[in-house]
Amino acid sequence: MVDQNPKRSGEPPVWLMFGAGGTVSAIFLPVVILIIGLLLPFGLVNVHNLITFAYSWIGKLVILVLTIFPMWCGLHRIHHGMHDLKVHVPAGGFIFYGLATIYTVWVLFAVINL
């Protein structure tokens, strides 16, 4: 018989942030590394243009996406990796996702005040 009132999990929002972080890390961070690690030092990208972009609203949005989502992905991987290794942290989900939330709020305030 099918349960008419199944217990709902709090995992879907966390998995959304985890999936977004993995996607951002895989697709966009190599481009950031290319720009900051190679093009900028060789003078192929103007620093003034990067700073101007960072102060625009779209630049702030890019900074938020490139910093918040990968952190959620990383902390989610650490949380589940420790569980897979049989290292059970008391209230591990609360600790790791709480750290990710604190980091998110901190980055939001930092970027808004940029």
Swiss-Prot record:
Keywords assigned: Cell inner membrane, Cell membrane, Membrane, Transmembrane, Transmembrane helix
Membrane topology value: Multi-pass membrane protein
Molecular function as annotated in GO: succinate dehydrogenase activity
Transmembrane portions of the chain: 24-44, 50-70, 92-112
Single Gene Ontology BP annotation: fumarate metabolic process
CC per GO annotation: fumarate reductase complex; plasma membrane
Family label: Belongs to the FrdD family.
Subunit architecture: Part of an enzyme complex containing four subunits: a flavoprotein (FrdA), an iron-sulfur protein (FrdB), and two hydrophobic anchor proteins (FrdC and FrdD).
Protein name: Fumarate reductase subunit D
Keyword Phosphoprotein: no
Compartments, as annotated in UniProt: Cell inner membrane
Function: Anchors the catalytic components of the fumarate reductase complex to the cell membrane, binds quinones.
Pfam family name, one: Fumarate_red_D
Highest taxon, organism lineage: Bacteria
